[in-house]
Amino acid sequence: MNFQEFKHKYGYDAATKMMQQYLDIKFAHLDCLLLFRMGDFYEMFYEDAVLASGVLGIALTKRGKNGDEEVPMCGVPYHALENYLTKLIEENYKVAICDQLETPEEAKNRGGYKAVVNRNVTRIITPGTVIEENLITTAEPNYLASLVVPKNKDTAALCYADLSTSTIFVVNVPELEILNELARLKPREILLSEHLRSSDLASNISKQLNFRITYQVDSFFAVNKCEKIILDFYKMKDIKGVGEISNSQICAIGSILEYLTLTQKENIPNLPKPKIIDFHSYMTIDFSTRRNLEIVTNSCGGNKGSLLSTLNHTVTKQGGRLLYNFLSSPLTDTHKINQRLNITEFFHSNLDITAKVRELLKKTSDIERCLTRITMNRGSGRDLLSIKYTLETANSIKEIFFDNYGFELPSFIEKIVKPLIRNDELYNLIEESICEDAPNNLNDGGVIKHSYHPKVLQLHDLINNGKLHIEKLKDQYKKETGIDSLKISHNNVIGLFIDITAKNANKINDPKFIHRQTTVNSVRYTTAELQKLESDLVNAKTLVVSLEKELYEDICKRVTKQSDYLRILASSLSGIDVFCNFAYIASENDYTRPEFTDDLSFDIVKGRHPVVEEALNKERKSFVHNDCHLSEAERIWLITGPNMAGKSTFMRQNAIIAIIAQIGSFVPAKSARIGMVDKIFSRIGAADDLIKGQSTFMAEMLETSAILAQSTKNSLIILDEVGRGTSTYDGVSIAWSVLEYIHDKLKCRCLFATHYHELTIMDNFLPAMQNYTIAIEESGKDILFLHNIIAGAADRSYGIHVAALAGLPASVINRAEQILLKFEKNAAGKGKNILSTESNNLSLFAIESPKLQNSKLEEKFKTIDPDKLSPKEALELLYQLKSNFIKQ
């Protein structure tokens, strides 16, 4: 829609000047909800009002007319804006904040009483650009990402930034891994080029991952333009100052910086240069595996029951974010993993230090986000106080280490403790300038200490002692004039004035006394001093707030110069918090340090699933531990056994142990020897992808296909029930061939659970595969699941027993047992296994499907025509059927 069409639609020419101003600004921000400041409210009009009233649950009213139609309107109080913004951001809306740039009085002075207050958009808030604490509802990073996919190349460039913590990264991502990488980062907003709008990639990002996409014209990502943006932003002359980056990475970085500049207007973020990430430096975990293993969220998208919720006993917000990043990105460099494990072991071996440090960490603040708000002019005195208190506490934490170890601290601990040394210059600046009870809002005043600046002291003295100053001036004038009856009074017409009786008027000879008014009984004067005092008294509150703002801005600039120091300090505190957390969890839950090898070992003794164990502990139940011994010689475990016996839990727990080990934590096991895992794939269950029109079987086959295509020798594959959802023969065939492919081609570690017992014979010709099953105890028809993994193969799945536990009607259970018995007799007569190893050309379809015989009741029903029965005959037949049913 062009501007002329827009003007016609909204009746621009007939609108008031204020509404024309609104429409001008709205046209420039058509992709945003426009919140338009009018006095004490932010108002919305037309479609914005209708949409916002529904989302926010506020009343929809009217304001004026557009032709014959009333204009919808709704509004929110300015002081409650952030509460409403939270809801809009949660719903992924883009919001433009239009503020008044002058007061109504200033507008009148500028253009008369009909003048419209100047307004303009001061900020655009999007899900990926929020920095306010109450707008960021989770402890995870709040990433804005830009994805650049060059044509005819198999690698994309991804830049991602968390504005709230002033961090920015760039990485080259293999094309096949784009969705997996986005699933790792979970960005709140992704910038994409317009030409990708109809692509499968955009569709998958939007529908499968459910991430917000903001499309930009193709020129937004032009390499020459983006390079200039980077150079200007970082005040560099050569792009090599960022590092060795490709043209695609230049486009990704430049587009993010441009978007941040456009949305933040004058408040340009103080971002460091992008950190270049090596894609292969962390474990690949695809989208489905993250969901199946419930690493950082549960299957419903919440936190409860996730691995993160179990492991997260951090005591700071920045520590929680770092743990989230650790779990999202386990390392693949064993040297770096062992460096982390060394730190964890130090805290685990010094639990007294750990306990003291954790108590002090609770007193620190999220100074990363405090610093961002300060540098972007959205901070408060409390943010500065938070930094001061954290500096003080960090120094106390440092002293704990040196009091216990002196100069004998291990080098890897000294490295993370060294940044805790207090920056006295910064500490003293805040200590001397900011009031301990500073309000959040600068407009309330009381942020700057009176003693920090003489003018502040003077103004507060005026505010608090105005009457005293008037009395002092009165006494001075009495002495100068010799008039003891001289008074200083006030009225609403002439303000403060010197009042003397008429008979004393002849004593006023000094020209500094300026005549103001004569009455019957008195003469009134003023002086330049009195006028200044009156002006100062009237304007003192306004002046002190204005002066405090100036001083506050100067203090913030000086604090911003210490950004590098504060970021290093924040990083140190968050790291200490995470490693103390690892030590705490290990001591509370009997975790042990894993050992890393250079082979395909995966030797876990008495391993446990941490999330399930935590849930059982709350019920005062014990978790049944299990071993897992994968190696070069025994890479594949084929696991058979009953439903509900714990196969899926066992497989998940081993994948989770690998993840926990490679983030640098101790693991829930008696011992663990692990060859580094570069990728984990888990296909355990799948829901129908109704959006894409895919069945459960199709979804599972797509996942399995991706696993086989992307796995390497160092990968760990977890597969459960491959081949289900189709005919038995098809399913067995697929599962068989997948096992062969993993064994012969990929040669990686794999846990493979199945109900196809025919597969158990494959250990005869797949030397690196072994059969394992779940131990049970049978007593008559009763079955006890022991949850122990033992060598061997199961010959039954006990599905009917599980169905009975689920509460299926007894008649259904009895009928199922009858049918199962017929199947088993039929199978016994034709050979136990559907598959045979006698021939390389396996006869998969040699056995016909058993046919079920109809019961006598079913045969009887076939002979009945209800329309030909009289009521009496129908009743007699009902009794007869009941009698036969009881006999059956």
From Swiss-Prot:
This is DNA mismatch repair protein MutS. HAMAP family: MutS. Keywords: ATP-binding, DNA damage, DNA repair, DNA-binding, Nucleotide-binding. Belongs to the DNA mismatch repair MutS family. The keyword Translocase does not apply. InterPro entries: DNA_mismatch_repair_MutS, DNA_mismatch_repair_MutS-lik_N, DNA_mismatch_repair_MutS/MSH, DNA_mismatch_repair_MutS_C, DNA_mismatch_repair_MutS_clamp, DNA_mismatch_repair_MutS_core, DNA_mismatch_repair_MutS_N, DNA_mismatch_repair_MutS_sf. The gene is mutS. GO terms for biological process: mismatch repair. Gene3D superfamilies: 1.10.1420.10, 6.10.140.430, DNA repair protein MutS, domain I (3.40.1170.10), MutS, connector domain (3.30.420.110), P-loop containing nucleotide triphosphate hydrolases (3.40.50.300). ATP binds at residues 641-648. NCBIfam families: mutS1, PRK05399.1. One of its GO terms (molecular function) is ATP binding. The keyword Nucleotide-binding applies. This protein is involved in the repair of mismatches in DNA. It is possible that it carries out the mismatch recognition step. This protein has a weak ATPase activity. It comes from Rickettsia bellii (strain OSU 85-389).
